[in-house]
């Protein structure tokens, strides 16, 4: 059975799972869902009700980082293989974006929901992105001239 990927096109976690599958040349059946109308088939295999969900015959991966790890178990062509220190840095950056950046981004984009000043949160997001830009420059990618998962 070809794995089935349940995804939502604008979800950043689903986006990074899709990107990893594409970079690793992994084939799957893509099922785009609407978050307000989740298919029963998806909820049967993952009761969390969040995307992404990658369904195999005998297992289910319902966290984007697990999907990325699975996709990269075998080296992908033209994708940078991390050294130990690069892998640690990449995990730190993923954590930064999943926690601190996401926190401020939500409060910037949806300030009326949170009753916060969007300008303060926009400034925090900008600082995080500027620090990332310093790590990248002058290279096109974080770890040099080769594309990587980060």
Regions found by a protein language model. Name each.
Residues 1-133, 137-138, 142:
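GST-like domain detector, emphasizing the conserved glutathione-binding G-site
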């Amino acid at each position: 059975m070809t794995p089935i990927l349940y995804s939502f096109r604008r979800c950043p976690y689903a986006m990074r799972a899709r990107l990893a599958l594409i970079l690793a040349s992994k084939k799957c059946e893509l099922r785009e869902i609407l978050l307000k109308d989740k298919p029963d088939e998806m909820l049967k295999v993952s009761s969390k009700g969040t995307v992404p969900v990658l369904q195999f015959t005998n297992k289910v991966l319902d966290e984007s980082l697990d999907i990325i790890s699975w996709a990269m178990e075998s080296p992908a062509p033209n994708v940078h293989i991390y050294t130990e220190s690069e892998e640690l840095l990449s995990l730190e950056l993923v954590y930064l974006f999943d926690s601190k950046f996401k926190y401020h981004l939500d409060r910037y984009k949806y300030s009326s929901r949170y009753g916060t000043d969007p300008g303060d949160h926009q400034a925090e997001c900008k600082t995080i992105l500027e620090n990332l830009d310093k790590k990248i420059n002058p290279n096109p990618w974080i770890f040099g001239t080769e594309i990587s998962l980060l």
